[in-house]
């Protein structure tokens, strides 16, 4: 993953590899970078594991899904991601899950995949303290909804700026023919 993120100019700020899916906070520097990096990493990893295990087919549930997120949601989403193995009862503490950015954030040191600085610069408390509170059920549902729909997550002015920049409608439209 780190090889392809480097090649296609994508920074990973947080991640958690779960048994059947992965969560990332990825910041692409180019328009196509995210699709190219994730797509190539997924293909290579799937091919390697399938060959090693004698398997065929997909390793992950569902397709690659992404959504643009306003900075206001960044910390809650990071908390959601790094606490995922705790919520799934795989570990008691997030730093005990070896396939997550939690340990890198707690130590304050980058690992081969994660750039810890952007998020550590925002959080004023030690990272362990930051992870001591889980996100609320409504926030979890919000993240899952935007992951399913691919619609941007942000307030009205954020969505409006995106619509202007991309020259397309992003807000939910009423069903039926458009006038």
Tell me what each language-model feature is.
Residues 21:
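Broad gene-expression machinery/nucleic-acid interaction feature
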Residues 1-14, 18, 27-179:
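Short Pro-Cys-Gly-centered "Cys-loop" motif that presents a nucleophilic cysteine in a tight turn
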